[in-house]
Amino acid sequence: MNAPDKFASLLALTREPFPASTKSYLAGSQPGLRVPVRDIQLTNGEVVSVYDTSGPYTDPAVQIDVRKGLASVRGEWIAARGDTEGYEGRVRKALDDGQKAEDGDRLAQLRAEAAALQRQPLRARSGANVTQMHYAKKGIVTPEMEYVALRENGRREWMQQYMQDAAREQRLAGNPLGASIPKIITPEFVRDEVARGRAIIPANINHPEVEPMAIGRNFKVKINANIGNSAVTSSIEEEVEKLVWAIRWGADNVMDLSTGKNIHTTRDWIVRNSPVPIGTVPIYQALEKVGGIAEDLTWEIFRDTLIEQAEQGVDYFTIHAGVRLAYIQLTAARRTGIVSRGGSIMAKWCMAHHKESFLYTHFEDICDIMKAYDVAFSLGDGLRPGCASDANDEAQFAELHTLGELTQIAWKHDVQTMIEGPGHVPMHMIQANMTEQLKTCHEAPFYTLGPLTIDIAPGYDHIASAIGAAMIGWMGTAMLCYVTPKEHLGLPDRDDVKQGIIAYKIAAHAADVAKGHPGARARDDALSQARFDFRWQDQFNLGLDPDTAKEYHDETLPKDSAKVAHFCSMCGPKFCSMKITQEVREFAQQGLQSKAEEFNRTGGELYVPIHRAD
């Protein structure tokens, strides 16, 4: 079977809608601006609408051919601005895919399979700047900003019944810890946040298929999933399947961290079929081009790689420009040294040449490339701690201060920027990370890997890190990079990806509730009510993972009759606290009814003679 057929068969597995769910769209102010939401139909007639990241893959009305890629969402908006131009683009090389011979059979096969995915690249016209930050600073509200506003608000009508009790809402009000979250997100609010640098909308002009989203402290906490092949395992079709699988379960962004063969072609398939922003670490591919020898890296090779990936449509680059020569010695006393792949590559280059990294010395040149395509910076934390005992040390914070300086340079060029953070941090040290980042990086969005709160959980690091992720998300982190059960152990498979995403959706949602994001708790209330009403199917379907919830329930009570029973296998029919509570309420109601009847029987008077009452 050829590769495209493999893609088609794999994607068929993950195109079905969620149980009891349909895709609907919120209409914007102009034709073509349609924001997806997922509507969950409840058995009591209610409809609960939730934020949706799955793109057209869960919409049966949309025809998808992965050989050709998704339909354009933003193409007309980009063209209407009149500040871009199409051009021939750089010449594709065998080395881009890790191949040595330009006329090899494998290379010809790869290119043939991806032929329909090729697009003419766009770039900014001479003298133009096409970043969302540039438009925002000029006071322009773009369609992307309106899209974000509609997406953040969602369809809120259904929430009102759960938010009518003013006393309860006051008691449960969140603590935003300094965030400024309005009750309604307006397009103007989005514009202002992007202009200030407090939010980014990752949306390369060469990725028109992307459904715009925002990463920022004053928006919903987002999560990122990592995929990518390696030198020892995985294939192109597996990575596309992981992409579709990841966004199905809630990944807001996906990073392609491929380090093996066929990097360029893998990225073609991923970007063209992705409705979410795609990020990369360009130094990985640059290293492949020099045979894996860090010392042989040059600015020219790296620059060529940036342009290659920008032309393909990558939305944000992780660039470890904060790893400076003077900081490397600060890691010498660490228990685990430098654990970032990109950080260790650049540290080795700096030591071999005994000079500052070309990522640092050419930073403004990099900005010129970024603003020509609207690629956002994800300034990498190459010196992040790799274990709890290395957290918050001098090396980590020295790099963070440099990232703050680089942020201001990027903003001078109107390049959207977010800051990457740790890593491994004990719970009691997390707040210091957030405080330091807000202060030194001028409120640019923070994007953290966890952090893992302990180091003794191999196989369960998704749990150890989700604890830290929930905390730092509440404190102000804008996006959480997921951790899977395979962290530190191996490359995650399909099931690992799902487990990592669900763990991080829990963390992100917990942070939104704690911050008091408008309406964040309504879905919890809807599920709680379904639980109290013994609407089992609604409980399953309102959860983050309906399939697993139903599977666990059916392990002991598989019959359809159990889906309407007023008990589960944990307590049984006689010890269910919620059933008992309902009976108590019924008894209380009967008692009140009895007293009312007695009141009416005695003439409806407040004070009655004793003989009449008798």
UniProtKB/Swiss-Prot annotation:
Metal-binding in keyword set: yes
GO CC annotations, alphabetized: cytosol
Domain of life the protein comes from: Bacteria
GO biological process, one term: thiamine diphosphate biosynthetic process
Function description: Catalyzes the synthesis of the hydroxymethylpyrimidine phosphate (HMP-P) moiety of thiamine from aminoimidazole ribotide (AIR) in a radical S-adenosyl-L-methionine (SAM)-dependent reaction.
Subunit structure: Homodimer.
Name assigned to this protein: Phosphomethylpyrimidine synthase
Gene name per UniProt: thiC
